[in-house]
Amino acid sequence: MNKKKTILLVMPANFGIYKAIEKNLVFNEFNVITLAYDESLFIYPSLITRLQTKFRRYIFRDKNAKHNSKSKVFQKTSQFQRISQQLTEVGGADYALFIRADIWSEEFLRNIRQSVKKDMIAYQWDGMNRFPQVWQNLQWFDRFYVFDPKDFHGESYQFLPITNFYLDYPLEDNSITSDFYFIGSHLSDRQDVIIKF
């Protein structure tokens, strides 16, 4: 009997999409360890940490100061400690799938990399230039998927094409109450296109 492969799923908790992806990975016989991060819950642990971050951001012009502070604070949370413990218990993950790789600091990615036996894979569900921090994190991934055709042209990094999510687990028989819906973040420059659709 083959042992199930373990995959670490790391992504934002936005809209609960991680639950569907996690369910699909389980359906495809993966042991899934999920790290769903809710950025909206971030608070600085102290006034000093907040002031140090602001100082780095404005005096040293460190554009990543807040980003790095968030990542460091997160690594001290019980959620991160739980994930680390789970990875230790299973002897590390076979794979890691990151959606929105821009959220994490290099230190965090380096720590996770040490727990992954095979491939670390990323998917940037927004265009690469919407969250420019992602460019600094490319080195940590074996494969990097993007959906926006603009991201394929003119870059030295070899991106791989992918569409948005395809979930192949059996769906519940729900009656349809609408014929069109949109799940995503509101961007005013997309509004006219959606209305005309």
Predicted ranges, named:
Residues 51-54, 58, 79, 115, ...:
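Compositionally biased, intrinsically disordered low-complexity segments
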Residues 1-2, 7, 110, 119-121:
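A generic structural signal for ordered secondary structure
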Residues 56-69:
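Aromatic- and Gly/Pro-rich amphipathic surface segment
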Residues 2-53, 67-68, 75-83, 90-91, ...:
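Nucleotide-sugar donor-binding catalytic core of glycosyltransferases
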Residues 26, 85-95, 105-120, 139:
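Glycosyltransferases and closely related glycan-assembly transferases
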